[in-house]
Regions:
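Sec-dependent N-terminal signal peptides
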Residues: 4-13
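Glycine-rich catalytic cores of cysteine/serine-nucleophile enzymes that process amide/ester linkages
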Residues: 33-92, 111-124
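Conserved catalytic neighborhood of penicillin-recognizing serine enzymes
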Residues: 67-98, 102, 161-177
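Activation targets extended, charge/polar-rich intrinsically disordered C-terminal tails
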Residues: 121-185
């Protein structure tokens, strides 16, 4: 009987590990997922992390949504965002230093996805968006790093894709795992 009870408790705990009530979300929370995009395996290999996509919770007239850079910067319902995660791999994190004023996300809406992973070029990739929103509020959520520091840059297939997209080894970038590690301390 004890063994059965133990197995049931483990199963319940495992199924609830990512249970987040939307009512407990706060503006500025960061949501990480293991994406199913075509570039996700490269990001995973290069950063050695399953967190290959992220977004930030913002307060909209329709309630809390996840602001994400996908094909364009857009608002996505929380359930839909986490529902797109591979194998239900997702988590939320709240930075210790939180944003104290409303996030002005509207200026980012509609910006195209940044295939070159460059800062300040009118396009946006997911972790750049989160990083910039915190920067807009005077908070350095994490440090950027050179593209050359990512393990994936040593893979021939990735190097070829980087050359095609005009990605320099010397340019600065921020990966979802950089934000995750910085706010999970």
């Amino acid at each position: 009987m004890k063994r059965i009870l133990f197995i049931i408790l483990i199963a319940v705990a495992a199924s609830c590990s990512n249970n987040v009530n939307v009512d407990t979300l706060k503006e500025g929370d960061v949501v990480f997922i293991e994406s199913q995009s075509s570039q996700s395996p490269y990001i995973k290999a290069g950063t050695m992390s399953k967190w290959t996509h992220c977004g930030i919770v913002v307060n909209t007239p329709d309630g809390m949504k996840v602001l994400e850079a996908s094909k364009t910067v857009r608002l996505t319902p929380f359930a839909k965002f986490i529902g797109s995660a591979k194998n239900e791999n997702w988590c939320t994190r709240r930075p210790k230093q939180t944003i104290s004023t409303p996030i002005q996300y509207q200026k980012y809406l509609g910006q195209p996805y940044d295939l070159e992973f460059k800062f300040n070029n009118g396009t946006m990739y997911c972790s750049e968006l989160v990083w910039l929103i915190y920067k807009d509020h005077g908070i350095e959520i994490c440090k950027s790093r050179k593209v050359s520091s990512f393990a994936m840059t040593r893979l021939p297939k990735v190097k070829k894709l980087m050359d095609k997209r005009g990605i320099s080894m010397d340019q600065e970038a921020v990966a979802p795992v950089d934000i995750y590690k910085a706010i999970s301390k």
